[in-house]
């Protein structure tokens, strides 16, 4: 219980520093998710087992930083592509209970863990589905999220047919992305002009644990920055 309270206070402080006001019940749910994630990680490999930062910072707070650049709306349909242990989809689903999240991953054990965590946390606006993204048919989304390490051009090719007109791809990535962005822009001819614009938002100033991290926002022809 003491560790849970420490995680709640840590997350509350970090979010407040970024102007993110989150009520106590939601902070407690986010901390519970962190505990679930660590517990499941002992069973299957969801996140690195050689952590250099607390899970509440490196994974959960990191996921929440997307909200600095994107306002999730009521009724918005969001795809979490390659969700792994539910990141960033589960933290964001807790923060935005009126937004719909679909979490997909090609590894069945990871999705089973996500389903168990969603059930344990009582989340009713997120579904975890075991599938390959190429097999998603007949569905489109307002926003696609990804925290996986795939190159940006591949993430764009996966996302283009799954995004509604004006939709946006948001990635959490690290390192020098110059070559990845160039490759993604070169590939847009066969993807109805997606991407037409790529924004980079470094977050190294927020925490030393994010020294090389950036939030990448990829727009199509008809999309615009959604940070109202």
UniProtKB/Swiss-Prot annotation:
rRNA processing in keyword set: yes
UniProt KW keywords: Cytoplasm, Methyltransferase, rRNA processing, S-adenosyl-L-methionine, Transferase
Gene Ontology cellular component annotations, sorted alphabetically: cytosol
GO molecular function: rRNA (guanine-N7-)-methyltransferase activity
Binding residue positions for S-adenosyl-L-methionine: 82, 87, 105-107, 133-134, 147
Principal EC category: transferase
Role, per record: Specifically methylates the N7 position of a guanine in 16S rRNA.
Record family assignment: Belongs to the methyltransferase superfamily. RNA methyltransferase RsmG family.
NCBIfam families: rsmG_gidB
Protein name in the entry: Ribosomal RNA small subunit methyltransferase G
Organism annotation: Pelodictyon phaeoclathratiforme (strain DSM 5477 / BU-1)
Gene: rsmG
